[in-house]
UniProtKB/Swiss-Prot annotation:
GO cellular component: plasma membrane
Membrane topology: Multi-pass membrane protein
Protein name: Uncharacterized transporter Cgl2211/cg2425
RCK C-terminal domain segment(s): 187-269, 271-352
Gene Ontology molecular function: monoatomic cation transmembrane transporter activity
Native organism: Corynebacterium glutamicum (strain ATCC 13032 / DSM 20300 / JCM 1318 / BCRC 11384 / CCUG 27702 / LMG 3730 / NBRC 12168 / NCIMB 10025 / NRRL B-2784 / 534)
Subcellular compartments: Cell membrane
Length: 539
C-alpha cells in the first residue's frame, strides 16, 4: 500500500469511496451509512500505520458538519422550546447526565485510563464531535509532547471499539420496546395530529358574526388553515390585510380535512362548488430563490405582495399551510393565489430560478464558520486550574443554531439552500470520519490483542443499553410521550441519523423527526461537555 502512503489525497478519496460503498450494504435490515468510512479508515491504517490524512481535513469536515446541522435545526429548536421542547430536552439531559455518571463509576472501579474511558463514553453515545472534543482537550492536560501523541490515539480507538454496538443496541432496543409496548404508529400519528394529510380547499359561507380579521382567524380560533379567497356580491378577491368577513361572504379555506371541519363549525356552513373555478383568480407554484424575501415573516412581506397571497409552502417533501409568522427559506416552493396578470410579478418577487439558487453566496457560510471557530476557542475556567471550551464542534454548532434562528441580518442571509446544506453536511462528516479513522490505526492494531479492548466493548455496550432503556421507558411510560416521538428523542440523544432513519421507516410518520430535531442540538452540546468533563474528572 505504498502508493496510499505516498499520496495523502488518494488515500483520502479511496477511504471515502470504499466507506460510502460499504455503508450502502444492508445487513439484517440495517446499514452503517457514512459511519462505514470511519471503519475503512481504521482498517487501512491498522494494516499500514503510515497511511495518514492531514489533521486539518478532520477539523474542516467536523466544523462543516455541525454548522450545517445547526443552521437547519435552529428555527425548529427554539420554536419547540415553547411547546414540547423543554420536556424532551429535560429527558435527554437527564439521560446523558445519568449515563456519564455511570461511566465515571465503571471507569473508576475498573481502573480504565482516562482517555480511553472518555472515548468509550463517546462511542457508546455514538457522538463523533464529542470524541473530537476529548482529543482537543488533551493538549491542555498533558505537557509531554511525546506522551500526548500516544495518548491522543486512545479516545479514537476506544470510540471505534464501542461505536458499532452503540448503534446496534439502540436500534434493537427500539424494536424490542415497540413490540413489548404494542405500539400502533398510525394511531399515535392521528392522535398527535401529524398523520400525513393532503391540503384541500373548501368553500364556507359565513354565518357567524364578529369574526376576527381573516389573517388572524388561524391564531385566534386555533385553526391550521388560511383564507385564500373571498367571494362577496358575486365578485371574488384576495383578502387584504385587516379584511373582515361579512355575513353571507363565501370564503375559500385551505387546510387538512380535520382542520377544515373545525373551520366550518367556527365560521359557517359548507357549500358546494369548485373553490378554484373563478377565472379572475389563478394560482401558481413558484420556487423561492430571491434572498430579499428570505427570513422575513410573511406578515411583513405582505405590502410587497399587493393583491397576491401565499397560501401553501412546500419545504422538502412537506406541504405547510402558510401563516403570518412563517418565514420563507431558499428552495421553498410556494403556492401564490392572485389575479392572472399578477402572477408574473409574484414570480419576479420570489425568484423562481433554480440556476440562481445553485450559485449560492459562500460569504455567509464562511463568516458563520469563522464566528463559530472563534467561539469554540473561548476557554471557560474550571476549578483546579483547567479550562473547558466548546472546540471545533461545539462552537460552530452553537453559532449556527443562533444564526439559523435569526435567519438574516439586514441583507445578509445566513441560511443556505436545503440541497446545498445536505451536500455540505454529508461532505463534512465523510471528510471527518476518513481523517479521524486513519489517525488511530496504529493504536487500534495494538488494542486488538489487548484484553482491555473487550472491557471497552462490553462496558460501552452496557452504557448504550442503559441510556436506551432510560429514554424509552421514562419517556413513553412515565412521561406519556408517544413512542414514535420517544424513539426520535433517543435517536436525537444518540445524535445518530441511522437510528432516525430506522425509526422513521418503521413508523412512517413525522413523530420521530419531531423528537429528533427537538433534542439533537442540545444533545450534541451536552455530550461534548459531558465527555470533556468526564476526562477532567478522571485525570
Amino acid at each position: 500500500m505504498s502508493f496510499l502512503v505516498e499520496n495523502q489525497l488518494l488515500a483520502l478519496v479511496v477511504i471515502m469511496t470504499v466507506g460510502l460503498l460499504l455503508g450502502r450494504i444492508k445487513i439484517f435490515g440495517f446499514r452503517l451509512g457514512v459511519a462505514a468510512v470511519l471503519f475503512v479508515g481504521l482498517a487501512l491504517s491498522t494494516i499500514e500505520p503510515d497511511i495518514s490524512v492531514p489533521s486539518l481535513i478532520y477539523v474542516v469536515g467536523l466544523s462543516l458538519f455541525v454548522y450545517t446541522i445547526g443552521l437547519e435545526a435552529g428555527p425548529g429548536f427554539f420554536t419547540s422550546m415553547k411547546t414540547t421542547g423543554l420536556r424532551n430536552n429535560a429527558l435527554t439531559l437527564g439521560a446523558i447526565i445519568a449515563t456519564t455518571a455511570l461511566a465515571w463509576a465503571l471507569i473508576t472501579v475498573l481502573n480504565i485510563d482516562a482517555a480511553s474511558g472518555a472515548g468509550m463514553l463517546t462511542g457508546a453515545l455514538t457522538n463523533t464531535p464529542a470524541m473530537a472534543a476529548v482529543v482537543d482537550a488533551l493538549p491542555s492536560l498533558i505537557d509531554d509532547t511525546g506522551q500526548l501523541h500516544l495518548i491522543a490515539e486512545l479516545p479514537v480507538v476506544a470510540y471505534s471499539l464501542a461505536y458499532p454496538l452503540g448503534v446496534l443496541i439502540v436500534i434493537l432496543s427500539i424494536a424490542i420496546f415497540s413490540s413489548v409496548f404494542k405500539v400502533d404508529h398510525n394511531k399515535e400519528a392521528e392522535e398527535a395530529g401529524v398523520a400525513v394529510q393532503e391540503l384541500k380547499g373548501r368553500r364556507i359561507r359565513v354565518t357567524v358574526a364578529d369574526l376576527p380579521a381573516l389573517e388572524n382567524i388561524p391564531e385566534l380560533l386555533n385553526l391550521h388553515v388560511i383564507v385564500s379567497r373571498v367571494e362577496r356580491d358575486g365578485e371574488q378577491f384576495i383578502p387584504l390585510y385587516g379584511e373582515h368577513a361579512r355575513i353571507g361572504d363565501v370564503l375559500t379555506v385551505v387546510g387538512a380535512d380535520e382542520e377544515l371541519n373545525r373551520a366550518e363549525k367556527a365560521i359557517g356552513e359548507l357549500i358546494d362548488g369548485d373553490p378554484y373555478s373563478n377565472v379572475e383568480l389563478d394560482y401558481r407554484r413558484i420556487f423561492v430563490s430571491n434572498t430579499a424575501v428570505v427570513g422575513t415573516p410573511l406578515s411583513k412581506l405582505q405590502p410587497l405582495f399587493k393583491d397576491m397571497l401565499i397560501t401553501r409552502i412546500r419545504r422538502g417533501d412537506t406541504d405547510l399551510v402558510a401563516s403570518s409568522d412563517m418565514t420563507l427559506q431558499l428552495g421553498d416552493r410556494v403556492r401564490v393565489v392572485a389575479p392572472a396578470e399578477k402572477l408574473r410579478e409574484a414570480t419576479q418577487l420570489l425568484g423562481d430560478s433554480y440556476k440562481k439558487l445553485s450559485d449560492f453566496n459562500l460569504l455567509p457560510l464562511a463568516a458563520g464558520l469563522m464566528i463559530g471557530v472563534l467561539v469554540g476557542m473561548v476557554e471557560f475556567p474550571l476549578p483546579g486550574g483547567s479550562s473547558l471550551k466548546l472546540g471545533n464542534a461545539g462552537g460552530p454548532l452553537v453559532v449556527a443554531l443562533l444564526l439559523g434562528m435569526i435567519n438574516r441580518t439586514g441583507k445578509f442571509v445566513w441560511q443556505i439552500p436545503y440541497g446545498a446544506n445536505l451536500a455540505l453536511r454529508q461532505l463534512g462528516i465523510t471528510l471527518f470520519l476518513a481523517a479521524i479513522g486513519t489517525s488511530a490505526g496504529a493504536g487500534f492494531r495494538s488494542a486488538i490483542s489487548d484484553p482491555q479492548s473487550l472491557t471497552i466493548i462490553g462496558f460501552g455496550a452496557l452504557l448504550t443499553l442503559f441510556i436506551s432503556i432510560t429514554v424509552l421507558f421514562v419517556g413513553h411510560k412515565l412521561m406519556k410521550i408517544p413512542f414514535g416521538e420517544t424513539a426520535g428523542i433517543l435517536a436525537g440523544t444518540q445524535t445518530h441519523p441511522a437510528v432516525l432513519s430506522y425509526v422513521s421507516d418503521a413508523s412512517r410518520n413525522e413523530l420521530p423527526a419531531m423528537g429528533y430535531t427537538s433534542v439533537y442540538p442540545l444533545a450534541m452540546i451536552a455530550k461534548i461537555l459531558a465527555a470533556q468533563t468526564l476526562l477532567f474528572l478522571l485525570i
